[in-house]
Amino acid sequence: MKKALYLGAVAFSVAFSMASANEPKIDFNPPNYVEETPSKEFIPELNKLGSLFGQGERPLFADRRAMKPNDLITIIVSEKASANYSSSKDYKSASGGNSTPPRLTYNGLDERKKKEAEYLDDKNNYNFTKSSNNTNFKGGGSQKKSEDLEIVLSARIIKVLENGNYFIYGNKEVLVDGEKQILKVSGVIRPYDIERNNTIQSKFLADAKIEYTNLGHLSDSNKKKFAADAMETQMPY
């Protein structure tokens, strides 16, 4: 009894682990080239007499766009994705036939050898008929999907690369009536693509990673239970 319970617990644990491993995930660590590229060195500029652009914390005239590490920038996420896929397969095969062994004939005058040849020919006088085999397979499938995502969030400049590009990362969490919404964005942007109001469209993000997740009872009701998912994954048919 204990052994059966132990085996059941092990099977349950394996099924849970395999079901969890099948969930898609995104790694938000910076790409390798971002880690390998040196950071840009910022050389402090001296105040210029008569210049309208001051060097203080809040000068009267200044570029309000994000420029340095830890500066904030607003990302306008506008992503649309659609896919239409169909496939079909039809396979047929058949096999069958007969096999006849060669005949043995003696054309000489020796009666003994003639009888031996007739005896051997009689023993070898068989036909082999191969059984017929027919195989048919037909399958197909289609998929159509469309998704729209429109969200605005703020991100922080993590690193300014040597060529002036920024690696940014943003995280936003909203909890409404027990439902938690999590949005994560990361990518590399060019300073020239930042608007004057310090916003940038998500289409300008290179190596973009965008993750939108819902957590709560409502979102759980739209997902398969891990046990059912694990069983369907391991079923051979």
UniProtKB/Swiss-Prot annotation:
NCBIfam families for this protein: PRK00249.1-3
Quaternary context: The basal body constitutes a major portion of the flagellar organelle and consists of four rings (L,P,S, and M) mounted on a central rod.
One of the GO BP terms on file: bacterial-type flagellum-dependent cell motility
A Pfam family that the UniProt record links to this protein: FlgH
Keywords, ordered alphabetically: Bacterial flagellum, Cell outer membrane, Membrane, Signal
Tree of life domain: Bacteria
Protein family (similarity comment): Belongs to the FlgH family.
Name of the protein: Flagellar L-ring protein
GO cellular component: bacterial-type flagellum basal body, distal rod, L ring; cell outer membrane
Purpose: Assembles around the rod to form the L-ring and probably protects the motor/basal body from shearing forces during rotation.
Classification via InterPro entries: Flag_Lring
Stretch list, region Disordered: 87-111
MF (Gene Ontology): cytoskeletal motor activity
Signal peptide residues on this chain, from the entry's feature table: 1-21
Protein source organism: Helicobacter pylori (strain ATCC 700392 / 26695)
Subcellular location(s) per record: Cell outer membrane; Bacterial flagellum basal body
